[in-house]
Design a protein with these regions (language model features):
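C-terminal accessory/tail domains of diverse enzymes
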Residues: 1-361
């Protein structure tokens, strides 16, 4: 949650602030060795009686691990370039850069972020976190791209902070969730007794290979792939399924009765340079709630990535209200499949079980 809730749109291993476990599979293994060596060195200096630990020790132990896939130490979620580098005076400023934090749109949202960080520093100063690091694997770019699971993870963080004596209310972070995972629309399928809600989700964009350009080479970012969160409340899993463009969504239970969530990954537009350039755009996305007992669609909705009429917007939104109105105007509670509808068997990915990738045929 702390890596993705407050970040910008460009996330993932090739972003400006990748997580330490997003680039290499053995990174956490090496990081645990570095932590153990730091503890050994601190104990060694304390045992010597001088009680002095060289301040450059942190830089030498971690600088080669807190880097992106190309070895750039500045592109890291935790950048220690200016903490205490022995290479020069500009690197000894005592600064730790948290590069995964994007400036929020309101001062009070920034205030809550700073309060949370200060409380965490105070807590870990008092009781250091020494538990084994979790190997999330592909779950990072699967269920933690969805706002529901990011919110659950933050709830666990806040519960731990409250148990340590730092009281944080979940409502303080509601604006952050609405800003990071904006609501697209909601439809009630009265015949099925359920509600279907769509929200924007996160998507780790890829950096393409080098291409020739005037004056040198360039590497484009493939921003043509987007993701939506599909959240269903009150669903009877033995009778109803949800499909998008004719494919069954692999909905997963959240632990709450009747609540199911999944992500839908799709090609929003077709740029000239992208991964799998022969795959066209999947918009508009047509969602259907299918009654498998009666083989018919009992409700649904339709979502357009851009202007529903196929036009381009002539101007940028003047403020957040206009941007929100455009997003809501692209959502329709009509347009789903009428009449008889047979849902195909659900196909769950071994690597990403919470996500349906429409690029897969």
């Amino acid at each position: 949650a702390l890596s993705y809730l407050f970040s910008g749109l460009f996330i993932g291993p090739t972003s400006q602030a990748p997580r330490v476990d997003e680039a290499r599979n053995d990174q956490l293994y090496e990081l645990e060795i570095a932590f153990a060596e730091l503890r050994r060195q601190v104990a060694l200096h304390e045992g010597a009686g001088d009680g002095y630990t060289p301040p450059w020790l942190i830089d030498r132990a971690l600088r080669n691990l807190l880097a992106d896939v190309t070895g750039n130490t500045h592109r890291s979620e935790f950048c220690i370039d200016k903490l205490y580098s022995p290479d020069g005076a500009t690197g000894r400023l005592g600064l730790l850069e948290l590069r995964a934090f994007e400036m929020p749109p309101h001062a009070r949202m920034s205030l809550v972020q700073q309060l949370l960080l200060r409380a965490m520093v105070a807590r870990f100063w008092r009781t250091p976190y020494t538990a084994r690091l979790t190997r999330w694997g592909t779950a990072l770019h699967d269920r933690f791209m969805l706002g529901t699971f990011v919110q659950m993870d933050l709830e666990d963080v806040l519960a731990e902070m409250r148990s340590a004596g730092f009281v944080f209310e979940s409502a303080w972070f509601a604006p952050h969730f609405e800003f990071r995972f904006p609501r697209v629309g909601e439809v009630e399928a009265e015949a099925a007794g359920l509600s279907l809600q769509l929200r924007a989700a996160l998507e780790p964009w890829h950096v393409m290979g080098e291409e020739g350009a005037a004056g040198g080479t360039v590497r484009y970012v493939d921003s043509s792939v987007e993701r939506l969160e599909v959240r269903v409340l009150g669903m009877n899993e033995t009778r109803h399924v949800v499909t998008v463009n004719g494919r069954t969504i692999p909905l997963q239970p959240t632990g709450r009765a009747g609540e199911y969530v999944a992500g839908v990954r799709y090609r929003a537009w077709a740029p000239p340079s992208s991964l799998h350039p022969t795959i066209g755009a999947h918009a508009p996305l047509t969602f259907d709630v299918v009654d498998t007992w009666m083989d018919r669609s009992v409700g649904g909705c339709q979502y357009h990535v851009s202007h529903p009429g196929g036009r381009n917007y002539q101007t940028f939104p003047v403020n957040a209200y206009e941007a929100e109105s455009r997003r809501l105007a692209r959502f329709f509670t009509i347009g789903h499949t009428p009449g008889r509808s047979v849902a195909p068997p659900v196909e769950r990915s071994l690597e990403f079980p919470f996500t349906l990738d429409l690029r897969q045929i």
